[in-house]
Curated annotation (Swiss-Prot):
Catalytic activity: 1-(5-phospho-beta-D-ribosyl)-5-[(5-phospho-beta-D-ribosylamino)methylideneamino]imidazole-4-carboxamide = 5-[(5-phospho-1-deoxy-D-ribulos-1-ylimino)methylamino]-1-(5-phospho-beta-D-ribosyl)imidazole-4-carboxamide
Protein name according to UniProt: 1-(5-phosphoribosyl)-5-[(5-phosphoribosylamino)methylideneamino] imidazole-4-carboxamide isomerase
Keywords carried by this UniProt record: Amino-acid biosynthesis, Cytoplasm, Histidine biosynthesis, Isomerase
Domain of life: Archaea
Matches recorded under PANTHER family: 1-(5-PHOSPHORIBOSYL)-5-[(5-PHOSPHORIBOSYLAMINO)METHYLIDENEAMINO] IMIDAZOLE-4-CARBOXAMIDE ISOMERASE
Catalytic residue list: 12, 132
Compartments reported by the entry: Cytoplasm
Disulfide-bonded cysteines: none
EC number, as in UniProt: 5.3.1.16
Length: 239
């Protein structure tokens, strides 16, 4: 999935605009403009993968930024992974046929673990399971409902179901530029043999190095890039 450690820019979409949330909570968003412009900016800066999230889909359960997603796919030629509102095999089929390379399942995987294997059987290697952790437990439905699941145990479970990778988001530090908690990532990495993508809290180049040292295969970075804490080129240089 990732031949070497990769820094992946986030393009989180709400109401057709790029936003970043603080702690995964609605109403805390800062807007950063047009998704296509943002995506092109990161591709021009050297991004090999884009991380797209339909936040309306994550919160409401139905994808609401399809036009923006399609526009990004048409405007760029890099790998794209997409999450938010993917609830069925048909949803995944549609996105993968549209040109998305990997679909990210969160709520759907918790509610119906079999969906991971069903999609993987049809599209091998295309499923990443999103484990969003808040107060040490996996949360779903736009980070509003706790499942009681331990992230490391859940990661191992979804690997057995056929997941090709895990996206671990530390919601407690998401969007806050407060630094990463590499020990939380290391717990998940140690539980599985598939790639683990780390997300949440990256604020410095040292954070990126810490995630790499913890065993993550890649990290998704949003607010730090949009706020100019460092450039994508600088991030690539340290890994």
């Amino acid at each position: 999935m990732f031949p070497s450690f990769e820094v992946i820019p986030a393009v989180d979409m709400q109401d057709g605009q790029v936003v970043q949330l603080v702690g995964g909570e609605r109403g805390t968003e800062t807007e950063y403009g047009d998704p296509v412009a943002a995506a092109q900016r990161w591709v021009d800066a050297g991004a090999e993968t884009l991380h797209l999230v339909d936040l309306d889909g994550a919160f409401e359960g139905e994808r609401a930024n399809a036009d923006a997603v399609e526009a990004v796919l048409e405007a760029t030629d890099v790998s794209v992974q997409l999450g938010g509102g993917i609830r069925t095999v048909d949803d995944a089929d549609s996105l993968l046929s549209m040109g998305v390379d990997r679909v990210i399942l969160g709520t759907a995987a918790v509610e119906n673990p079999d969906i991971v294997g069903e999609i993987n059987d049809r599209h091998p290697g295309s499923v990443v399971v999103s484990l969003d952790a808040k107060d040490g437990e996996v949360v779903v439905s736009g980070w509003t409902e706790s499942t009681g699941l331990d992230p490391a145990e859940a990661a191992a479970r979804y690997e057995a179901e056929g997941a090709g990778g895990v996206l671990f988001t530390d919601v407690d530090v998401e969007g806050q530029l407060s630094g990463v908690r590499a020990d939380e990532i290391a717990r998940v990495v140690d539980a599985v043999d598939i790639p683990v993508i780390a997300s949440g809290g990256v604020s410095t180049l040292s954070d990126i190095e810490a995630l790499k040292d913890a065993g993550a295969a890649a990290t998704v970075v949003g607010t730090a890039l949009y706020e100019g804490e460092f450039t994508l080129e600088e991030a690539a240089a340290v890994v």
